Amino acid sequence: MRRYAAVFGILALFGVSVLSGCSTPSEAETTGGRTISTVVLTPPPPPNDLTDEQVAQITTVQCPDVITEETVRALVQPQADAAEFFASTAQCGDIAAVVAAGEGAPAFVSPLQYVEAPCPAGTLFTIWAHYDDDLIFGSPTIPDALDAGQCVRTLYLTGSDAGMGLGYGYGREDGLRAAYDVILNAPLEWEQRTVTLTNGLTLAISRPIGDPRVTLFFLRLPDGGLGAGGFPATGMTSLPQLLAGKIRELHMIDTGEAVSLDGISSTVVELYNAYQPQTVMAHLPGSAQGTSGDHPDHQVTGDIVMRTADSGQVDPAKVIYAQGYPSEAHPQNLEGDVLQRKLDAFAVYASHDPVIPCSTADTCLNVNRFGGWLVRQYLVPHTEIVRP
């Protein structure tokens, strides 16, 4: 010990102060002819860049009693970004999930990162025009993904109202939930909620309680009909008109919220970024060969997804398209248990849709055109579509 004391004494003699810990930089002071260096300790930077004003806004104005100032200041940057977004969009109830994410929270790209449970086995993201399109043209791909343990996240662009009002569309939504109960092989209780995305649009969500594998998103835009011109009940507006630039926006048939073409595209991209799916499936684009005679809403839905892939916002290698009405011209390629499961799910759905005159697998198989579509599924990768 005397040796170390002597060393420190010598250092002190030469005007060097010895301090423990990390420090930056030194300040020199001359006293009595001796120069003494004083180390200035710099406090660590805060974990996020929220200003005092932003913190106060979150904790006292937007979401009082939900999160404390101390907790907000302790959030790492991705959590702080998410908390600020949820607070600014009046979605305070989801902030608890942000706090629970801890320091390993990923960069914030969408509230869906916290609204939804993670899917370790991967995700299939599908985009359709109408409520039965996934059951007809997306099957058996969707049931197969669920059997493999993957999650399925499905976005429906229209309210599937066929000009018959919200009640008809809501009934079809009930049919979807019943059909997915069959696919999941369990009667489930479903919860309904909404989420406001980073593009400002609010989506309706339906998902089974206790089973995170399925989530259905409803944009509820006007059904365009087979003539592509829409219906009087929804102002004679449609997706084809929007894509063609004939109108600037559509309005959700339930809330009246305005939605532009960019709004639809950014919704697709946000869901894609939130879920990072292994596969994206949609209708075959109208600008590709093989869609002549398909429903105009189908064609436009495919075109919107195709544009996101062409622009690189969605990985083209992950995108596949399902042929719609024209698939009936191809040979039947589904049979046995695979076909039976598809028919059983569709029949349950159809029992909620008064336009489709069937409620059993056998009777649905005999419905004009529907039977032909149900016994087939034809898929085309994005990299193989043929454009005229």
Describe these PLM feature segments.
Residues 309-330:
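Short, flexible loop segments at boundaries between secondary-structure elements
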Residues 16-37, 42:
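C-terminal region of N-terminal signal peptides and the immediate post-cleavage residues
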Residues 39-107:
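Post-signal/leader-peptide non-cytosolic segments of secretory proteins
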Residues 268-286:
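Proline-aspartate-enriched helix->loop->beta-strand connector
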Residues 296-304:
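Charged helix-capping and loop-helix junction motifs
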Residues 91-94, 101-270, 274, 306-307, ...:
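Active-site rim/loop-helix segments in enzyme catalytic domains that contact anionic ligands
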Residues 1-8:
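Bacterial N-terminal signal peptides that target proteins for export
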Residues 326-353:
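PAPS-dependent sulfotransferase catalytic core
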